[in-house]
Amino acid sequence: MSPPNAPSATRIPTGARLRQLAFAYLGRREYSKQMLIDKLAETGADLNAIQQLVDELADSCYQSDSRMASMTVRSNLRRGRGQARIKQDLKKYAIDPALAAAELAATDWLQQAIQLRMKKFGATLPTEAKEKARQFRFLQYRGFDLDICRQALAWQDEDE
């Protein structure tokens, strides 16, 4: 038997303590259903109890994969990342592929690539092959598709 003042890390949370722990995690940041299950499982609690708790939290809208997906997409768009990089993040967070596709479909990827290219390299289009290749690699590294990269490098502002 462990002493009464043993560190809480050695105690296995159950019931109310497990719920309290889940709310503490969700209070700090958004978690996908699978991420929250994995995080709570690290404590050594019963997997059935964890699954039941996470389902209950999802039904009560405390946890939402949809909210997690939209937050991830918005966050990555602000960082200048393309569709492939964002898909990779959503997959890492165990977001349902149909939900991920719905979130990604709402974005104009060409406009994102153009804005990113202009922010990094300026409004003038590259004329030399070396500079075109450099900008093309930059956009590809950020996760934009080949067609989007080509279109972004060919796009010319009508105001000029």
Language-model regions: role of each:
Residues 1-160:
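An alpha-helical, amphipathic repeat domain used for nucleic-acid recognition
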